[in-house]
Amino acid sequence: MPPGRRRYAEIINSEGEGGSLPQAEIGIIGGSGLYNLPGIERVREVRVATPFGRPSDAYRLGNLEGRKVAFLSRHGRGHTLLPTEVNSRANIYGFKKLGVERIISVSAVGSLREEYRPMDMALPAQFFDRTRQRASTFFGGGLVVHISFDTPVCPTVVEVLAGACKDLGVRCHAGGTYVCMEGPAFSTKAESNVYRSWGMDLIGMTSLPEAKLAREAEICYATLAMVTDYDCWHPQHDAVTINMVLEYLTHNVENSQKILLRAIRAMPQPRSCKCASALAHAILTDRTRISSTARKKLSLLVGKYLG
């Protein structure tokens, strides 16, 4: 049996027999260019089984800047998954199973504002959901949960990322609203201009439902957005194409790596934000009416509140 498959079989067996998975504290979701950060040590790949299906890829775990980190390729290695096809529930649940407490999501975005220029970084403070075909909650099936989501990103993680950008001299916009579209087609001019009239600043296809699911899993979450284009509204710039996006992404990978390295090193412990207790007052279902099936399926997320 090839080494990769043998490692996967061993992990599945250890889970089935009550064994433990290797643990991490910081998760990174992004492209394959982030897998090989300079200085990462003791690298191993882990496939994680979840009640929500298979994650996009194996998690790549290692030690970096004295911290245990886990990387996941959102669209799978080789970019085989459309944004709609990404199993965000499995991806986030897998991070939770690995013990991750904070997630940095790295993604490409279009700019809806003149001041957000290609090659800039952005740390959106708000999301506007325009997706239509994605499962956006772990709950249901007899267990009703309503999380607070007025502040969808973790202020601590955003502050650390903003500080890293400042220290490195990388032009970064902290704040603003990211509208998440379904895709895979880019916007029409009508859509792009409507989003601008609504006060949106950035447009992308990936941060939702990730951010909602991370909050349900009580994992801190923030998006490090790489601006690659002006969508299609700007009269002095061509409409976005995949070649344009890839060109700017290639140029921005080095900046992203440097920001992540500095942010991972600076991330404070232990957590003091509200993300860690997001479900404390969010479970609505009468505890006596929650089925054993729901309890078992979701025990990783709600077990500490159900007793």
Where are these regions (language model features)?
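Intrinsic disorder/low-complexity segments
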Residues: 1-21
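Metabolite-binding pocket within alpha/beta catalytic cores that recognizes anionic/polar moieties
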Residues: 15-151, 305-307
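Non-catalytic positions within long, well-ordered alpha-helices that form the structural scaffold/packing
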Residues: 96-99, 196, 215
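Generic non-transmembrane alpha-helical segments
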Residues: 156, 160-171, 258-266
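Active-site/ligand-binding-proximal alpha/beta "capping" segment
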Residues: 167-201, 288
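Zn-dependent metallopeptidase/amidohydrolase metal-coordination segment
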Residues: 205-243
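His/Asp/Glu-rich mid-to-C-terminal helical/loop segments that flank catalytic regions of hydrolases
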Residues: 232-279
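A short, charged, Gly/Pro-tolerant segment at domain boundaries
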Residues: 272-307
